[in-house]
Every structure is written in structure tokens, then in C-alpha cells.
Amino acid sequence: MTEVESSTENNVIVNKNKRYRRDKPWDTDDIDHWKIEPFTKDDSKESFLEESSFATLFPKYREKYLREVWPHVTRALDKFGITCVLDLVEGSMTVKTTRKTFDPYSILDARDLIKLLARSVPFPQAVKIMQDGVACDIIKIGNILRNKERFVKRRQRLIGTNGQTLKALELLTQCYILVQGTTVAVMGGYKGLKEVRRIVEDCMHNIHPIYHIKELMIKRELAKDPTLANESWDRFLPQFKKRNVARRKPAKIRETKEYTPFPPAQPPSKLDLEIESGEYFLKKEEKERKKRAEKKEQQKEKKKEKEKERMKAFIPPEESSKKRKRD
């Protein structure tokens, strides 16, 4: 019996890519393979060969706040060996690597930090971008719509009354969201950033955020059930139908003419009309005589019309043919 079992074990078909794979006793389930290990000074023994720098402009209204906060910014970046320069004349912020910089990715985080500060994100929130696992995304919404009134209306729809819609999105996506001018600054995990970008762009394309909020709430409840981890959630998610609202009909309906590749004929000029009628060939005296005759005819017609109106006053009114009833 044991020989049969051993023969069946040896005859098990193994995929080509797993043929030479061996068991790894050190690889246990409690190890998180996606965890980002912190980068310390011991990991980088030598300084960088080249200096890297990034610069960004900021609006005039941010100048006062940045001047107050800049000492805190320099202190935060000194921990990573990065210098920063605030140019108030040019209106720009610059970050540079130094010989003390040990983390090569920290310069990219510093670049994101000055971008967020320029987009009105407060410093205590913006400095969190220097942490591992925190990313940012600046979504441009100004070039999606042409009509300014419609843009303001849809941007307000994203914020909601007293910022309730924005707060709900922050709780569901676990991201920090700030709507400022024609951009939306988002901070959080990569999964949350992807969801927020989709919601913001859909809102600008006239899809209300409440539909996405309902969907995210259902997904959060489904994630708690381990039995549904490997199943499709489409049957649980709501399917919203698009409604084509009847538009108001225009007051004047213009008739579309048939398309012709040839341009319309040129209308006849005054000279052409005179040649056709033969008036062009008349003498000056004859032309004046003709005009006088036409004028006299017009005067006669007007005189007749006025006489008719005067005679209306002398016409007696029609008496009623009904006889009065006797008492």
C-alpha cells in the first residue's frame, strides 16, 4: 500500500515553471512581501555624484504663509539632507540634494512637498508626504469644462453642503482631499488616489459623487466578509442607468437648406434693374417727368384713403331690428 502511494506521489504532474522550485522554510505567512523597508543612512555609504534639484512657482497670495512656515520646511528637509530655497522675487520654491543626502527617493518627496505647499495645502499635512507609503496627486479640473458657471456648479457639487461630500470621500478612500481653484490636491495611498481621481473626473463629467460614495460603502462592507474575497462583487454593486433629460425646444426652428457646393448668385444691382426696365436709356428730363407722374399717382391714392376715413364719420350706425317688449 505504501509503495502504491509513493508511486502516485512521484507521478504528480508539475508545471514547468515550478519544476525546480524548492520549499522555503524561512518564508512564512506572517511575512509581508509588500512592506516597504525604511531607508537609513547605513544603506547608503557614499554621497551622490550629481546634484538633483526641482523648482515650482507659487501664487502671490501664498507668499505670506510660506514666509511664516519656511523655517519648519527647512528643518523637516534637513533630516533627509535636502536644502530648500524660497525666492520671493521670482515667486518660486527650489529643493536640492546635498552631500548629506542618503535616500535617493527623498528628493522626489521634497518635490511633491513644494508642489502641495504651492496648491494651498497646509504645512502640517503636506509634510506627511515625506513618509513611506504616502503619495500625492494633483488633479487638474480647469480644462475639462468651457462654461465657467457650469464648472463652478460641478466643483461645488464635489465639495457638498458644508463640505460633507468631501468628508465622506476622505473617510471612504482614506485620503486627504483639498479643492483649490482649478486643481484638486490628494494625499494618501496609491489605491485611494486612483479612486479619488476617477470620482473627481466623473464629477466634472456630470456624474454625481453620491453614486461613487454608495459604491465605496458597499465595497467596504463586502471586504469584511472573507468568503467573498475571491468572488466578483458586480452583483452587489448598484447599476445606475443614465437618464436622458428632454431639453427645452428652441422658440424659432430654422429650416436647414440643402447644401450646394456653388455660391449663391449675385443679386442684381440698381444699374442692372434700370437697364432691364429701359429706364437707363431715358434722358434726364424724361426720368424726372416719370418720377413726378409716379409721385402724383401715390398722392391720389393717399387722398382717396383719407377721404374714405373722413366719410366713415357721416355713416349712421345700424339700428337694432329687435322690437321692444311691452310690459
Curated annotation (Swiss-Prot):
CDD domains per the record? KH-I_KRR1_rpt1 (cd22393), KH-I_KRR1_rpt2 (cd22394)
> Cellular location of this protein?
Nucleus, Nucleolus
Q: Where is the composition biased (Basic and acidic residues)?
A: 294-312
May I ask which residue range the UniProt record assigns to the signal sequence?
none
Every copy of the KH domain together lies at 135-205
Which keywords appear in this protein's UniProt record, sorted alphabetically?
Nucleus, Ribonucleoprotein, Ribosome biogenesis, RNA-binding, rRNA processing
Cellular compartments per GO CC: nucleolus; nucleus; small-subunit processome
Instruction: Please list where the region (Disordered) is annotated.
Output: 247-274, 286-327
Entry's Gene3D superfamilies?
K Homology domain, type 1 (3.30.1370.10)
Q: Which GO terms describe its molecular function?
A: RNA binding
Please state which protein family the record places this protein in: Belongs to the KRR1 family.
Q: How does it assemble?
A: Component of the ribosomal small subunit (SSU) processome.
Summarizing the function annotation, the protein's role is: Required for 40S ribosome biogenesis. Involved in nucleolar processing of pre-18S ribosomal RNA and ribosome assembly.
Q: What is this protein called?
A: KRR1 small subunit processome component homolog
What is the organism field in this record? Schizosaccharomyces pombe (strain 972 / ATCC 24843) (Fission yeast)
